[in-house]
Amino acid sequence: MDTETVSPNFDDIRPLNNSEVKDAIEKLVANEDFERALRYIKPNLNWEEFSVAMRACKTKEEFKSTLAYDAVMTVAKNTTFSLTISGRSRLPKDKAACTFISNHRDIVLDASFLNVMLYDVGYGMTQVAIGDNLLIRPWIETLVRLNNSFIVKRGVSVRQMLEVSKTLSAYIHHAIKNVNESVWIAQREGRAKDSDDRTPVSYTHLRAH
């Protein structure tokens, strides 16, 4: 589902609209750093064929379910024994949107593995929260927003923090209630490098707003 009716107040954090997909793909196809990153995952990648496949994607959904899905499964094949999912009986029977909260051990794979497994069982992929501290290059922001991620602003002052938190909470509510897309958020800010997966109280406040 598209986010064309999103309030302008969310423009700096929301995923791309489908009307923005074509321009985003052209920027990525022309970016040498993006090409190098993909070749790291798939060394034998035929860039010309991949560029054609990229340009064939007219919506975020097409991009996610084909190229992004394939990239994640390539990583899974090369780095894991298997991917499994449990707890399917707890998913909403009517496929209604909801919030997924999980521990956070990898920058992108926690949510990526969840999304491909949800897709495989016929449940929609989630919008993914990603910290702006990871968007170290413009092409990375373009890619994650094309892949239906929304931005969590981290480097803000104490004075700005409350307003940023309210806006983020309002966006999550909008995505679930109005766009009918589930969201994924990590249960803490940053990865749990010390294996401490406890959820900060502030995250429960975020959901309550």
Predicted regions, residues:
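Glycine- and small hydrophobic-enriched segments that form the cores of compact globular domains
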Residues: 87-183
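Conserved small/polar residues in nucleotide/adenosyl-binding loops
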Residues: 204-209
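Charge-dense, low-complexity intrinsically disordered segments
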Residues: 58, 62, 155-162, 194
